[in-house]
Amino acid sequence: MPALKPTEFMGRVVWLGVNQDRAAALESTSRDVLSLPFGGPPEESHSGVTRRSCSRVSRQYPKGTEIANTRQVSIVSEEDLALIAQDMGLARIEPEWLGVSMVVAGIPDFSLIPPSSRLQDDASGTTLVVDMENRPCHLVSAVIERGYPGIGKRFKPAARNRRGVTAWVERPGEIALGATLRLHIPDQPVWPHLATARNG
């Protein structure tokens, strides 16, 4: 029995990019096509089948532990970027500032799609697995602050639940600008004890 349900929610790819050296700068550089082998985009500093654990999983592993890399690709929505900009009092937030890999348009509340959802290129079959919501960090604030002094600190609150998701490659291939990604969701109910677990 299939465990994933194809939906009619579609995201159109409106921007692609890579961050080639995150030690040098957070910003990403635009691309027309992303090559996506199993380790993620070869040019991307976040690529690799494994990675060193960071603060996001500090309650699970000592920092620097080698773990599976479920953060190969960072994806945000055009709609969420517009809302972030609006709340910050800016005309626009450029995807480069966030160091993202991809911007999609057309999926509502994109940052909150279920973990383990798939984003599948309808034409090529290239498929990304959503790990979880990406959380806003101070590094983006610093990038914005350079261009808009006094504004950067507004990013974290404005980007709450709008920072997109991280994902990893399940089926290799390419995704190009203009591609259509179909959302496939786990066909299961929400765990009834989620609220209790969060408050525990």
Pin down the residues of each PLM region.
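Electropositive, beta-rich accessory/interaction domains or terminal extensions
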Residues: 1-118, 122, 132, 192-198
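Glycine-rich active-site loops that engage anionic ligands at enzyme catalytic sites
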Residues: 104-108, 112-171
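Short, well-ordered loop/turn sites that connect or cap secondary structure elements
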Residues: 113, 174-177, 181-183
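Short, surface-exposed secondary-structure boundary micro-motifs
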Residues: 124, 133, 180, 186-187
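Short, Lys/Arg- and Gly-enriched loop/turn segments at beta-strand edges
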Residues: 129, 138-140, 187-200
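Acidic/glycine-rich phosphate/pyrophosphate-binding loops and surrounding catalytic core
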Residues: 147, 154-155, 167, 180-185, ...
